[in-house]
Amino acid sequence: KSDGLPTGAVSGFCSMLFKLLEDARSDDSKNKPTHFAVIFDSARKNFRNEIYTDYKANRAEAPDDLAPQFEYIRKSVEAFNLPSVELLNYEADDLIATYAKKITEAGARVTVVSSDKDLMQLVSNKVRLFDPMKSKVIGEKEVIEKFGVKPDQVIDVQSLAGDSSDNIPGVPGIGVKTAAELINKYKTLENLLNKATEIPQNKRRETLLLNKDKAMISKQLVTLKNDVPL
């Protein structure tokens, strides 16, 4: 703008939203959207910081040219006449998980528009993701390609592998590939940890035994709450 206010993020957001709405109007498939909502994070800190104080502590503040645009992104949602939702002490992903549960229990399908891999745990025969940057639908097949396990096991893989971008510790030395191998064999994180003494590889066995608490804390951090009081 002429007054120096950056508008790149607002413009990009509005363009994406406009395209989604236009595509929805022309969609004649069984997945044609009937309801829209935009969900925001309400603050940097939430209940996960009470579980693990270093959660997302490595995240830098929003760049100076981005921070002032958040207000206008919210106003643009109003201009599109769409509802927006945010709730103190919860992340947007928790609200998405809660709405997805409520909607599917009511018998409808859900499309979550996001490229966030953390939402892949929600994928089911009634919930799919849509990555607007790649125009790609993400279902069970794509989740398996990404994590090596089915959607309902993604949480356990993330609990082991951790996530440096969110400062989630996981188990040191275990990445996504190894985590997927372990979860495919032992089915759940809890079963793996209970049977860790049976693991033949000495280093892996000792690492798991020494870091059980980190794995379980990580599970609390990566698990999206689907019972948020909306």
What is each of the regions a protein language model found here?
Residues 26-37, 80-82, 105, 124-126, ...:
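Non-catalytic nucleic-acid-binding/docking modules located in mid-to-C-terminal regions
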Residues 1-113, 117-137, 214-217, 223-230:
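Noncatalytic, basic helical substrate-engagement surface that gates or grips nucleic-acid strands
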